[in-house]
Structure formats: structure tokens, C-alpha cells
Amino acid sequence: MSGLESRGSGYAEGISSVTGIVSRTRTGELSVRATSEIKLLSPCLHPIPLTLSCEQTRSHNRTVNLLVHSAARDILRARAFVLTYLRTFFSARDFLEVQTPILSDLAGGAAARPFVTHATVLGAGPDSLSLLELRIAPELWLKRLIISGFDRVFEIGQVFRNEGIDATHNPEFTTCEFYQAFASLDDLISLTEELLSGLVKSAVEKVPAIKTNIYAKGFKFDAPFLRVDFISTLEECMGMTFPDFVLNSSEDSEDAKQFLKRLFAVEGIPIPNPGTVARMLDKLCDYYIGPILGSAKTPVILMNFPEVLSPLAKSAKADGKDYRIARRFELYVDGKELVNAYEEENSPFVQRRKFELQLRDREVDAEAHATDEGYLASMEWGLPPTGGWGIGIDRLVMLLTGAERISDVLTFGGIKGVVGQE
């Protein structure tokens, strides 16, 4: 006899075994008519509570939290379903699952502050590679594999960002990224629609915790998804037209900064710190477009970002305009970003220029992209036109299950609970 059903409330003696005949009482309770003595297999030294009402206890003793609350276990089962679905989906389309380095001398692939550590086996001299960083994204490693001749690759794994903690952010989290040679932005959108609509349909049929939440929230994942243009929507919301030198700010950054700072003052919006062009445009998006994204109960695709916001994406001249836009989209559901995807920049010359422009911002913004000379050297061997895509697994599970905190969908909770976990 084992499992939670055998342990009732109050003081439990532990996990026991018994041989007998399974039957039901007159009231329908499942029972065992013992034909042998009960044998204690493992003692329990504490009374098992009916519930844990103290939030600190729940976060710092995840073991007991999961033991007591079936709803917490249901979320982890839902997470396992999502991971299995993703692997099956990509494998069925000839994607190769790979594992790329978590430790390296330079964390790249995203704008974020990395965790830093040291490797004693590599030496501690000033010219050694003893200083290591935990990856903030697997992107640059996966694109190296595309260069190596693997046309379709994907990876599901942890990434680490030394940043703030809140209901939707944890320094350690899980992503799924894929890269496909010769895939266009339209291909990425079509695949995203197929993946998410299929995932939700299957989950509603097979995972009760997800079915209950999807119906309660009124979410609809039927394709095609709604598309929203970044620049035209922002201009409509603000009642103005941005000058080309702002949208082409990678070429005229200082003038763009001053224009945007004056605009922030007029609009009464606090200037982000640091006040780079990318940060300010991103802030305007959150302020004006964010409410539009948050009001929809269907997936919304935000696309045609200014070039400066996407240093790793291929860019092109906007139709009928004199500014350039990134071949990129983000997908939002209920105001929360789930997917980031774009056509990858595959020119080593253009990529170096974009890295160098980001390096100027790095003087005031520690999270700006650093120049990865190793990746640039790999690009010299020829990166074919490639589409790249990433989704946050934790946020996806939160959305599907209705979990309010990212710690609820992590096996042992967020970092605050992991540190000092009982």
C-alpha cells in the first residue's frame, strides 16, 4: 500500500505494505481485507497537514507542498504534457533535438545580464579562460549547427539571466528554440499557428487542469492569429508620425535619443534607465501597444519592429518607407509575451556592424549585446537564410494552467524558495 490515498490526515506512520483482497465498504470506500500483517516500509516522522496556508512554508518546502496539494502536482503533469507535445511536434517535422553548452566564455543570443563564475581547471591567470558565463540563450550555438549542415534543430533547456524576480520572471527558466534553414517569417508564423492551436486542442482533450482554465478564461487559439504592426500602431496610438531618423536610429543614434527624450517629456512618461534608443522605443511599445495586447483573448502577433530593437534579425526596407524594419515578430496572449521569432541576420559584415552599434550602448547598458567574435568567425563559413524561433516554457504553462506565479510551474519553485529549501 503506497501513495497519498493510503495516508489520511493527522499523524501518518509512513508508507506500509499489506497483502489482502481489495474491496469496497457499504459506503463505497476502497479498502483492503488484510490477509497478512501490515509491514512498515518507510516511517513518516511528521503529521501530514490537510493544507499549507502559509506562503513561506509552501515556497520553502516544495516537497510537502506537492505532497499535500494535488493541484500543484497537476500543474507539473501539465508541464510534462507540454514538453512531450513540443518534442513530438518538432521530431515529426524532421527537427533534430540537440544540447548546446550552458557554460562558455561569453553568453550571447539575447540582451540580458549573465551570471558569472570561474573554472579552476582552466587556470586563474589574467590571460586564461577561467571567467565563464552561464548562457542567457542557446541561439548562437544553434545557428552554428545550421552552418554545420543541420538544416533543422531545436533545443529545450534552461537559461539563466541575472535580473529581477517577479510573478513572471525567475533567474533560471526554460525555453524551447528552433532554427530552420530557408524558413521565412511567413513560414515561422504558419508553424507557430499550427503548433499552438494543435497544442491547446490536444491539451484540452487530455489534461483536465488545462481544459478547465482555457474554458474559464475564454481563450481561443484558432488560426490565423491577429497581426499588429509595431510602428503604424504606435503612431496611431500616439497621434503622430515618427521621423525616419528615429526609426533608422542605428545610423543616427544621438539625434534619435534627443528626439525621444523630448517626446517622453511631452507625454509625461519616465525615461527608462539607461535611456538608449532601443530601451525608449521598447518603453513606448509597453505603454501604448501593451493595453491592446493585454485586451485580447486570442494570440496576437506583433511584427515589423524597428531595426534597432533586433540586432540579430535580418532587416529590410519597410514598404513605401525610407526606414528599415526587422523581419521579426513576437506573439502575445493575454498581454504576456510567449514567442520571439525572426529571420536571422546571415551576413557576417552586417552582423558585425550591428554588434558594434550595440557595443556603443553597452557602455551605458550592461544588458546590450556584446560582440561575439567566435560566432562571427563561424558566420564566415556561410549561414544560409534561416528562421529562428523561441518560446518560454514556464510562461506557456502558466497561461495554459492559469498559474499566477512562475514559481507555481517550476518543479521546486522560484529561486527565493530554492535557496533554503527544506
Regions from the language model: what does each represent?
Residues 1-422:
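Class II aminoacyl-tRNA synthetase catalytic cores and aaRS-like
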